Amino acid sequence: MAPALPITLPSKMSLRSLKWSLLLLSLLSFLVMWYLSLPHYNVIERVNWMYFYEYEPIYRQDFHFTLREHSNCSHQNPFLVILVTSHPADVKARQAIRVTWGEKKSWWGYEVLTFFLLGQQAEREDKVLALSLEDEHLLYGDIIRQDFLDTYNNLTLKTIMAFRWVTEFCPNARYIMKTDTDVFINTGNLVKYLLNLNHSEKFFTGYPLIDNYSYRGFYQKTHISYQEYPFKVFPPYCSGLGYIMSRDLVPRIYEMMSHVKPIKFEDVYVGICLNLLKVDIHIPEDTNLFFLYRIHLDVCQLRRVIAAHGFSSKEIITFWQVMLRNTTCHY
């Protein structure tokens, strides 16, 4: 009979090491499962735009107009209406536009109207500011305002207001542009560009952003939550610096807006509506018509653009005055 092999029992040290190893393994497994359950692993990879659509118009906005333009646009047939988002306190910015690219009302016989889009200054609006806005409106008659709070996160409400106003009060405008107060518009170039189009229906253009990723970082201005937008990629859309559309699209987009819950970024929101309507963005052949970022443009370059973003009120006035001079450009 073979002798029995000696059995070596694990020492207390080995048992303690095994115990800690199992504990660490369990903790690691828990952390992995927790990490996999985080929202960035739940992001929907395949974009289905019907996710945003409600069959009933439950998102129709019922804010009231507290100021409207003097001119009866419904009885006019302007070639182009430019709608400029503005904050109630931005009096200098509005005035800079009134004396520069928004001053001239007719280009080669084609009527161009410019209006400013505003919300309320605060829930308890400052009475002095309210009176000054009333006076400003009495003087110029170019302010369109509703009674929602004027904040960055409510820019989408301001855009919905713009589409509603055109649909209800200015339906005969041939083209509509939405832009901001810090954008330099070469109005003459814009009118020329629109006159040279081969088609005037189902047209939407601007600075195109294709396959632009949603930002989940800490910078709040560009952050959007997973709850608000669960996709990694935004739809094709045009930057809010300035997008242009034909009049037939305005009521269609406005109607679609009543079926789509507003999100933080107004330009992306319009892009979602365009995708649901199966409207493609027209990408300009000339890539130098729209400038998204602040760049150092000289007067000759500004004569060739339609819209350039990132200008102060003082710069808009200065560049406009220089552009009007008979400067010879050799390129």
UniProtKB/Swiss-Prot annotation:
Name this polypeptide is given: UDP-GalNAc:beta-1,3-N-acetylgalactosaminyltransferase 1
Gene3D superfamilies the UniProt entry points to: 3.90.550.50
Gene name tied to this protein: B3GALNT1
Cited Pfam families: Galactosyl_T
Catalysed reactions, as listed in the record: a globoside Gb3Cer (d18:1(4E)) + UDP-N-acetyl-alpha-D-galactosamine = a globoside Gb4Cer (d18:1(4E)) + UDP + H(+)
GO biological process: lipid metabolic process; oligosaccharide biosynthetic process; protein O-linked glycosylation
Source species of the chain: Sus scrofa
UniProt topology in membrane: Single-pass type II membrane protein
Segments on the Lumenal face: 44-331
Pathway membership, UniProt: Protein modification; protein glycosylation
